[in-house]
Design a protein with these regions (language model features):
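Short, strongly hydrophobic alpha-helical membrane anchors
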Residues: 1-26
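Hydrophobic alpha-helical transmembrane segments
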Residues: 20-52
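N-terminal membrane-entry
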Residues: 31-35, 131-141, 180-184
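Residue-level signal for the membrane-embedded core of alpha-helical transmembrane segments
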Residues: 34-37, 41-44, 144-147, 151-154, ...
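Predominantly long cytosolic amphipathic alpha-helical stalk/bundle segments
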Residues: 57-170, 197-224
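Hydrophobic alpha-helical transmembrane segments and adjacent short intramembrane/lumenal linkers
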Residues: 167-181
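Hydrophobic alpha-helical transmembrane segments of polytopic membrane proteins
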Residues: 181-195
Length: 224
């Protein structure tokens, strides 16, 4: 490792290119691994963010349409029979599963209580599907800055070792190593900030949709 640091220190004085690519190329294996990990986390986070944004928009529009048609229908059974086979909307799936249970129920005693319990289970199942990916966003938001900080600390340690080996404290020796180290911190923040903002937004959207499902369940129970 000392040999690598020595050769790095020798070349730093003549290499003052601070482009992002140059910072990555000059970094050692550990810092490169941190950078690649953070870039990967950021890309996957953005994939989740885009998918969830589209998903919530679609779900909310379909839910409004579903509720409007449902409450205008003659009866729950008539509306159930008119539903398409392939459903994706959580509220539509909740209603479909509930109606299947209701129509198959032979014993009508305590039906409301049993339906209420089943609706709670189905709501939980739909919310688990809806909140898929939330954990990753929360994890990236909370850990990415610390991963970036680790890369920064490691890079600064390498810079100090370069100074000790070269016995040169000039800015040309110190600056490139510090820049590489701070690059990792910047990437950590770049990955974490969108993930935290998106997680908070989607978590709030999820709570609002949960309230919609619970309200629908209560109204549905009142008419069966």
């Amino acid at each position: 490792m000392e040999a690598d640091i020595t050769s790095q220190a020798v070349g730093l004085a003549s290499n003052t290119d601070f482009s992002l690519w140059s910072l990555f190329i000059r970094a050692d294996f550990i810092v490169k691994s941190v950078i690649l990990m953070l870039i990967g986390c950021s890309i996957y986070s953005w994939a989740i963010i885009i998918e969830k944004f589209r998903s919530f928009k679609k779900i909310n529009l379909e839910t409004e349409e579903f509720e409007e048609k449902f409450w205008k229908s003659k009866s729950a059974e008539t509306f159930y029979n008119s539903l398409p086979v392939n459903l994706e909307n959580p509220m539509a799936l909740l209603f479909k599963d509930s109606m299947q249970t209701l129509l198959k129920a032979k014993n009508k005693s305590n039906l409301n209580e049993r339906m209420s319990n089943m609706l709670e289970v189905n709501i939980e199942k739909q919310m688990v599907t809806l909140e898929k990916g939330f954990t990753f966003l929360a994890t990236v938001g909370s850990t990415a800055p610390f991963i970036g900080l680790f890369g920064t600390v490691w890079g600064i340690m390498n810079s100090f070792q370069s100074i000790a080996i070269s016995r040169n404290t000039s800015l040309a020796i110190v600056a490139p190593g510090i820049a590489e180290a701070l690059f990792a911190t910047a990437l950590g923040l770049l990955a974490a900030i969108p993930a935290v903002v998106a997680y908070n937004k989607f978590n709030n959207d999820s709570k609002k949709y949960l309230q919609k499902l619970e309200n629908f369940s209560k109204r549905f129970l009142s008419i069966i």
